């Protein structure tokens, strides 16, 4: 019995105590590693939060710049549309008067042609007197 007791004590001191010490050491190392990991994780979370906040701030700043450009471009396009409408309006008026002038010129040319067929000498006198008047008005 003493021998069996000695065997158990030797086995306990040779094998079990070192294993228990290793388990305790590994538990302590695990706690320390967990603390370091948690600390490093906290630092990582803090850095991630800072970077995320900076990213959001930059995105808001960029968004405000884009909105400002959008507003300026919208105002420029609105002004361009208004100018285009004004040009279109006056272009229509100008085209109307040009067509009216061409109709009037056609009537006078037709009238002149028919008068020239009737009395060429009188028509040529009219053309000559008009040329003299125009020449005197252009080059006084």
Swiss-Prot record:
One of its GO terms (cellular component) is host cell membrane. It is a multi-pass membrane protein. It comes from the Viruses. It is found in: Host membrane. Keywords: Host membrane, Membrane, Transmembrane, Transmembrane helix. Coiled coil: none annotated. The lineage of its organism: Viruses, Adnaviria, Zilligvirae, Taleaviricota, Tokiviricetes. The gene is SIFV0049. The chain crosses the membrane at residues 23-43, 93-110. This is Putative transmembrane protein 49. Its main location: host cell. It comes from Sulfolobus islandicus filamentous virus (isolate Iceland/Hveragerdi) (SIFV). The keyword Transmembrane applies.
């Amino acid at each position: 019995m003493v021998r069996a007791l000695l065997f158990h004590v030797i086995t306990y001191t040779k094998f079990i105590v070192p294993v228990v010490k290793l388990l305790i050491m590994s538990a302590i190392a695990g706690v320390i590693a967990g603390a370091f990991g948690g600390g490093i994780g906290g630092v990582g979370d803090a850095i991630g939060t800072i970077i995320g906040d900076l990213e959001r701030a930059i995105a808001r700043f960029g968004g405000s710049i884009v909105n400002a450009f959008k507003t300026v471009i919208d105002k420029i396009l609105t002004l361009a549309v208004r100018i285009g409408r004004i040009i279109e309006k006056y272009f229509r008026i100008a085209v109307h008067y040009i067509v009216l002038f061409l109709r009037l010129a056609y009537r006078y040319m037709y009238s002149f042609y028919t008068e020239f067929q009737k009395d060429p000498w009188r028509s040529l006198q009219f053309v000559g007197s008009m040329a003299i008047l125009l020449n005197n008005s252009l080059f006084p």
